[in-house]
Structure formats: structure tokens, C-alpha cells
Design a protein with these regions (language model features):
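Sec-dependent N-terminal signal peptides
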Residues: 4-15
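Sec/Tat signal peptide C-region and signal peptidase I cleavage site
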Residues: 15-21
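A glycine-biased structural micro-motif
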Residues: 24-25, 35
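A cross-family detector of function-defining hotspots
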Residues: 31-134
Length: 134
């Protein structure tokens, strides 16, 4: 199963397909990538809407402010750890063509323009990659 998911991720990257969300994309662009949310959120007091999507072996949460994504989280349905290649693919998808710099001795990254951070954290027993605009 891991090999199949990795193969799909690598093929999509190799053929230049846009398969991962990028911070700042509209809710329509996110829906084109992930389909209809399995849980459509409603705006909170700050106007932030959190939608939940499921695509392939991943559960994806995307937070929107004024219709544009400001944070994303990715977790595997099977609760397995992410491979380095999966992490790289998700970060690349949210790079906006800027490199990510890994923090020493941590599973955390900062985008070179200092406008986004990412980190790995276990939430509800699931390894989760979180990506957030600053």
C-alpha cells in the first residue's frame, strides 16, 4: 500500500500535475483538487472556515479566510507515519515556488520567504503535517 501511494505521488509530481493544495488558493481551486468536502465548515467568530476533505489515503483539513486557504493539515487514513518523500511532496505543493528550510533537530520547516511554516505533530493518535501561512 505504501508503495502504491508513493508511486502515485511521484507520478503526479513527475508529470507536472497540480495535485497538492497551496496556501492562498481559493476554495474553488481546493475543491478542484480534493473534491467536495466531507465536512463543510461554517465561519467561526474570526471568519475562518475549516473544511475536511478525503482524497486517496489522506484526510485533509483546509482553513479558509475570505475564501482563500490560510492553513492545511494532512494525515494518513491508516495512521501511519509519513515518509520523507510524502513530506517533501506536500511541502513542495505549498511552496509557491520557494524552498523550505528544515529546522535543525526538529520536524519543522520554514518557507524561505518567511511567510509559511510547517511541522509534524501527532494529533488524536495520527501523525499530521501542518502547514500555516504567517
Amino acid at each position: 500500500m505504501k508503495r502504491t501511494v508513493l508511486l502515485i505521488v511521484m507520478c503526479c509530481l513527475a508529470f507536472g500535475g497540480h495535485v497538492f493544495a497551496a496556501l492562498g488558493e481559493s476554495d474553488d481551486q481546493i475543491a478542484e483538487l480534493f473534491g467536495k468536502p466531507i465536512d463543510q465548515g461554517v465561519p467561526d467568530k474570526k471568519g475562518i472556515t475549516t473544511n475536511v476533505y478525503e482524497k486517496g489515503n489522506y484526510i485533509i483539513l483546509v482553513q479558509f479566510l475570505k475564501g482563500y486557504s490560510m492553513a492545511e493539515s494532512y494525515t494518513r487514513v491508516d495512521k501511519q507515519e509519513f515518509s520523507d518523500k510524502e513530506i517533501s511532496a506536500f511541502l513542495e505543493g505549498s511552496s509557491n515556488e520557494r524552498p523550505w528550510n528544515k529546522q535543525p533537530d526538529k520536524q519543522a520547516w520554514e518557507r524561505s520567504d518567511h511567510k509559511a511554516t510547517a511541522w509534524l505533530q501527532t494529533l488524536s493518535g495520527r501523525p499530521t503535517l501542518l502547514i500555516q501561512a504567517q
